[in-house]
A protein has these predicted regions:
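Conserved catalytic motifs of ABC-family nucleotide-binding domains
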Residues: 16
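Catalytic Walker B motif of ABC-type/P-loop ATPase nucleotide-binding domains
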Residues: 20-23
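Helix N-cap at the start of a conserved alpha-helix in ABC-type nucleotide-binding domains
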Residues: 31-33
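H-loop/switch region of ABC-family ATPase nucleotide-binding domains
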Residues: 55-56
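A short, surface-exposed alpha-helical micro-motif characterized by mixed small hydrophobic
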Residues: 61-63
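ABC ATPase "signature
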Residues: 79-80
């Protein structure tokens, strides 16, 4: 659960990576654990850590991201600032996805 995620993050930080990769870090967690893991990731973002985060937590992604990439069928469909991608998506698929996740 969340304890395993936090331990994995601590092990990663011990290696002092230039970039931290997160692939759906909250997908298998209980709802109460999700917020704990997101708080750890938010703190890393506030420290200025470079991270690549794959997530369906759209509100969180919007808050902590400096750049957003929207993928569809494994291809980059849209890329830009959180404001641009979340508020003014260009592609029809991205518009549909964002409107269903508000």
């Amino acid at each position: 659960g969340g304890q395993q995620q936090r331990a994995a993050i601590a092990r990663t930080l011990a290696m002092q990576p230039k970039v931290i990769l997160f692939d759906e870090p909250t997908s298998a967690l209980d709802p109460e654990m999700v917020q704990e893991v997101l708080n750890v990731i938010r703190a890393l973002a506030e420290e200025g850590r470079t991270m690549l985060l794959v997530t369906h937590e759209m509100g969180f992604a919007r808050q902590v991201s400096s750049e957003v990439v929207f993928l569809h069928q494994g291809l980059v469909e849209e890329q830009g600032s959180p404001q641009q991608v979340f508020e003014n998506p260009l592609s029809a698929r991205c518009k549909q996805f964002m409107s269903s996740n508000r």
